[in-house]
Amino acid sequence: MGVKKKLKLTSLLGLSLLIMTACATNGVTSDITAESADFWSKLVYFFAEIIRFLSFDISIGVGIILFTVLIRTVLLPVFQVQMVASRKMQEAQPRIKALREQYPGRDMESRTKLEQEMRKVFKEMGVRQSDSLWPILIQMPVILALFQALSRVDFLKTGHFLWINLGSVDTTLVLPILAAVFTFLSTWLSNKALSERNGATTAMMYGIPVLIFIFAVYAPGGVALYWTVSNAYQVLQTYFLNNPFKIIAEREAVVQAQKDLENRKRKAKKKAQKTK
């Protein structure tokens, strides 16, 4: 997926999160209980019960933290697919850049040819643009269900964790700031191994945390806690499973090996010329 498309997706995600916030705070406010009949209410209450079970009678906040870790661990294969897709996309960028230089025209024929050649590159390198969307799409109903659980299930909306009323916004802004910081670290680590960067990439790196901060400011404290833990988990996942520093070192090793091979060939050629 190109950077411009990612920016559009990020904007759409931010708008969706704000809409979800409005739905949770200004939408249906009737309580959800074990007797609620519709499917969505049953799903919301099921999530609430999982959180209560994981709280171990210590704190609902502990339950949300463990619930987040559980969700992220279950979704780990999906997120790993996203990370692999992102890495393949990074590796494809030099070839994509060359194609854009080869077909710079804005006419329909040039654009069609460019898209055809780009599809060939993506297919050859095993890049599927949809792989980047799955983690976002899967997490959306989870976050929305958590919104609803914190505003409509009694034992969650009255829960506390440290100084936070989990059913209300965090007026101290500590959690929104932490959510933004961990989002930035996650994005920064993901972009660290990029062989090429541009203004759009930088805009994403700073823009996504801003969107998350705004979202977390107006969200219930429990949702801000979920987002903070989720992105902290993402930082650890990226570092241990897709370490950008290791990727950079491997890339530099390949470049150095190529230089060494060229130097040996050059020396061998000079030596052969001297013996003639």
From Swiss-Prot:
It comes from the Bacteria. InterPro entries: YidC/ALB3/OXA1/COX18, YidC/Oxa/ALB_C, YidC/YidC1/YidC2_Firmicutes, YidC_ALB_C. Pfam families: 60KD_IMP. A lipid is attached at C23 (N-palmitoyl cysteine). It is found in: Cell membrane. The keyword Transmembrane applies. Residues 1-22 form the signal peptide. One of its GO terms (biological process) is protein insertion into membrane. GO terms for molecular function: membrane insertase activity. The chain crosses the membrane at residues 58-78, 130-150, 169-189, 207-227. The keyword Lyase does not apply. A lipid is attached at C23 (S-diacylglycerol cysteine). Interacts with KhpB (also called EloR/Jag). This is Membrane protein insertase YidC 2. It comes from Streptococcus pneumoniae (strain ATCC BAA-255 / R6).
